[in-house]
């Protein structure tokens, strides 16, 4: 009986199957990379604000401590946005006629809140507690980056689940002494893993990666 298909058919079939698998894998890879990209996460994108508050000036230049403005960071889940009164503690005397700060003065006079543009916008299904992290040695700059060098704040990290899990699985790589939590210029020492392992034990850190830890 004569052969129905040409002998090259087997090769074409194998190439087609391999090509299909490769194309599917490449598509998945591209989708995942796009999902991690700043285009989706909006990382490193400075946001315009009603008042161009500069962390570079206030933190980097003047040395203002994070807790002066974010007063609840070590006490509650949210770090807190300072009321205008906090701004006016200084700006009632300094730059008190600056047109740039008129929205601050108007907010203070009228008792209305300034509508800041949110930068770190976690989805509603993700729970994050600031106090639980800073009180266990996770520094501000670990998540927020060098805000002392940011004229306008941007989101330094992706805030995606894989980024969170990296720290939850290996906290010894990131934990620091409590005295350095608010030091945004802190650099991990050469023996960070040894130090971190010791601090994880001292602080009683129990890494949790179960879904219910963050999705409540």
Which sequence ranges carry the predicted segments?
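Primarily the internal scaffold of c-type cytochrome electron-transfer domains
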Residues: 2-6, 94-126, 171-216
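Beta-hairpin (beta-strand-turn-beta-strand) motif
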Residues: 58, 92-93, 131
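Soluble extracytoplasmic domains of inner/organellar membrane proteins
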Residues: 124, 129-178
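Short Cys/His-rich "knuckle" micro-motifs
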Residues: 76-80, 97-101, 150-154, 174-177
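Nucleotide phosphate-binding site architecture
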Residues: 59, 88, 134
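N-terminal export/targeting leaders of redox proteins
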Residues: 1-52, 56-60, 64, 68, ...
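The canonical Cys-X-X-Cys-His
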Residues: 63-72, 84-93, 140-146, 163-170, ...
């Amino acid at each position: 009986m004569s052969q129905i298909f040409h002998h090259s058919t087997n090769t074409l079939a194998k190439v087609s199957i391999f090509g299909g698998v490769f194309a599917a894998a490449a598509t998945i890879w591209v989708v995942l990379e796009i999902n991690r990209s700043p285009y989706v996460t909006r990382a490193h994108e400075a946001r315009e604000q009603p008042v161009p508050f500069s962390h570079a000036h206030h933190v980097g230049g003047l040395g203002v401590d994070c807790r002066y403005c974010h007063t609840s960071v070590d006490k509650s889940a949210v770090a807190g946005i300072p009321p205008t009164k906090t701004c006016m503690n200084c700006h009632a005397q300094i730059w008190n006629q600056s047109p740039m700060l008129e929205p601050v003065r108007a907010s203070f006079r009228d008792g209305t809140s300034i509508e800041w543009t949110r930068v770190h916008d976690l989805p509603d299904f993700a729970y994050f507690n600031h106090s639980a992290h800073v009180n266990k040695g996770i520094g501000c700059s670990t998540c927020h980056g060098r805000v002392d060098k940011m004229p306008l704040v941007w989101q330094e990290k992706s805030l995606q689940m894989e980024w969170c899990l990296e720290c939850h699985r290996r906290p010894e790589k990131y934990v620091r002494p409590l005295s350095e939590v608010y030091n945004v210029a802190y650099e991990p020492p050469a023996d960070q893993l040894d130090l971190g392992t010791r601090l994880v034990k001292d602080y009683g850190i129990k890494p949790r990666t179960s879904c219910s830890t963050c999705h409540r």
